[in-house]
């Protein structure tokens, strides 16, 4: 007899891990497949000289709101420690620096004091953000939001962030500050609905944190759950081909890359929408065209360095450099000089337990920058590519030293990763957040043309780690059914188990 499961989940990034824990905790039999040798996707860490470094997950928001509630639902909150993270924005052209306080009200007050002529417009802006937050049920799981639809239709769905700021007559560096978190979802202000931006910006601006041990803390909690709940989790394995569809347009079997076969009731993809096309049988032309019309977000070039213990200018937190206040130019790649670079300073522990200071820098990039090496793979790229990486890392370091001169001579390179590195190890396309969240665009989510196939792929509803977890919760509700969903969420949030 072939192995059988209720849910076959493809991928163990944050969406796959969340779906696996939700379904298994609710009593479903789950098999999760990961094509890599280890789980976690962008949540993974790697090590150089015994120092842990983040792959793609650097910080999150909303620990006091929905993200913390999601950890309770998954039964892993006790395994996760949040570290409050400061935010400083540096405009490289003017030299102006803004230290932004945590908390929406504190941020509003701070910006009004810095830009008094725009105070009325700022009050309107933040009132709109609060309205979006208050009317998004998924952000209020403890007060009945768990039993409402995921995202309601709001008036803010029908105006872009850029158009709203135009209406408010907000320009220059203030506009850059309000659009700054666009680099955390990858969609330009002129494309993203204000509501989608507000949902991301509110959590990050209100409660910016990194996790102690980074995304590895979530991966470790997931692996513990796979043992506790007897989850069938397989690495280095994916689907080779699917069985035949029945008259009901459902498929219930698959041959795996390890040569085994498996039967299932439901199958869930968590990959980039275009990766789904490679596996999905009988994808019609209309469906294929819809997916191929999606636009990818930017990628990141990431550089890592060790910082001497006696270095001046080291302050834990996020130091963000913007070469322009025009985030459309930054995130569309229309101006090669328009860049956003985040520098995350943190204290980590080496494998031997000793503390060390690190900085992780991530700068927005686009495929054209590395197109000459598209047909190469990690470990087999030419000297010109290595020179590009070294030059890029040096430029990112020099930009930082302009504004933090006390670090000169105190930074020691550990590693770097281009958009191609991320393409080879994670997403098949190297995009940091999957597809862009354009206004009036219907992203790929839920049921697919094969009637028992579903997707909770990158940016299905909301981008980022918290967005992916909430997307997974919505799909769990659809497949588990309302009765199981209500009982599960009520029990978890009341007991905190």
Description of each model-found segment:
Residues 481-497:
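Active-site-proximal substrate-binding core of FAD-dependent oxidoreductases
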Residues 2-128:
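N-terminal glycine-rich phosphate/pyrophosphate-binding loop and immediately adjacent elements
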Residues 456-483:
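A conserved FAD-binding loop/helix module that cradles the flavin
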